[in-house]
Structures are given as structure tokens and as C-alpha cells.
Amino acid sequence: MSDRASSATTQDFIRSRPAEGALHTPDDRRVVALPAAVMQALHAGLPGESPETLRPVLYRAGYEWGLQEMLHLHTRLRAELDPSDQRDLWHLDAPFVLERWAAPFAAAGWGACVFDLSEHGKRLLFVELRHSAAAAASRDAKVNAPVCHLYAGLFAGALSFYDRTESHAVETECTALGHACCRFIVGPGPLIDRAETARQSGLAHEAIRRLSLDPKPAAPAASAKAAKIPWKK
């Protein structure tokens, strides 16, 4: 289990090249600095997109981004390891891998994560996120549900790469709703379906966590509606 917040300085992961007017990562990928207004506009809605269609767009973008960042990390770690030790990323310690994956996001202002891998044997990951850029962008908006769909996709993509099997994610608490931090549950699709339905029925995070750990199917609350999960076609 990793209960340490991922931490890093901007200088560790973002290098300025004043002569070029550019920012780059240590592995020479270009970085673009965007104002908070861009994030606000993105979550206010894309042209022609309703809130219902915007959610899966953000989730899928995050999912693919999470996969690609894990792929880049895999390449970097192979370069860092001793030539005689060329293990694949998924053979390395999960807390180490996830913290290395999350560190550039924290350095770039996307927030700091705490990863709880105590139930990783059941393919479950619990994430606590502080300083979510998406939640901050929605702070002044009237929202009645979690808004960090991009982050949910990121965490699902990262765990999918590490576990080499598809995982999904749901946000159960969000600072845009007044919670102290944003919380996510990442795991197999059927369990996340249940977690999303439970969230929609009004269950708190800890109750949803217990439900996701219970192998017995639980009857949904009378007021619960079928969950509209972003990754379902």
C-alpha cells in the first residue's frame, strides 16, 4: 500500500528553453502551459456537446492519456535500469510505478495523489486526489455530481497498463461538491458499475468502498437508476 502523496518539483519534470520560448520534459517532449480559463471552458462544454456527451469524451481522453504516459514511463524506466535488469514495468513494485507515473502530473499542477493499493490483489485501486484542476475549474459552477472525468480516465488508463487488463474508474467524492478531496475507485468494469450506481443512489465513499469489496451482489436502493457509465457503448 502506498499512502504517500506523490510529490515533485516543477524543475524535475519541466525544463525551460528561453531561447526557443519552449518547455520540455526531460525526455524531450514539448509541454504547453495553459491558463486556468482553458480548463474552465473545457468543463463548461465543448461546442455542440451536451453535459451527457461531454463526460465520456473527457473520460476517454484521460484514459488514452494515462495509457500513453505509462508507455513513456515504461521506456524511461528501461533506460534508467541496469542493462542486465530489463524488467517490464508491470514486474516492478506497483506503488513505485504509480508514484513515478503521477509525479509529472503533480509537478505540472494537476494535483497530488495518494494511492491505496491494499486491495490490489482484487484488482482494486483507491485514489485520493488533492488540488484537482478540474474541480477547481468548476468551483463557481452549480454542479450536482463529481466533475473529474478526465482524472477518472487517467487512473483507469494507468492501472489498465500496469495490470495488463482493462480497468475502469469512478469518482465518488469531489471537491467541486464541497468534499475535502477527490476520491476515486479503480477496478474491473462490473465492480465500477456497481460503485457508480451506488454513488448515484447517494451512498458515501466509505459505503461504496465496502460495497466494491463485497463479492456478493447488493440490491440497489429503490431510488437508484441504472448507471450511465462513460465507457459503456
Where are these regions (language model features)?
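N-terminal accessory segment detector
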Residues: 1-125, 133-150, 167-181, 185-233
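Active-site helix/loop of acyl-thioester processing domains in fatty-acid/polyketide metabolism
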Residues: 146-164
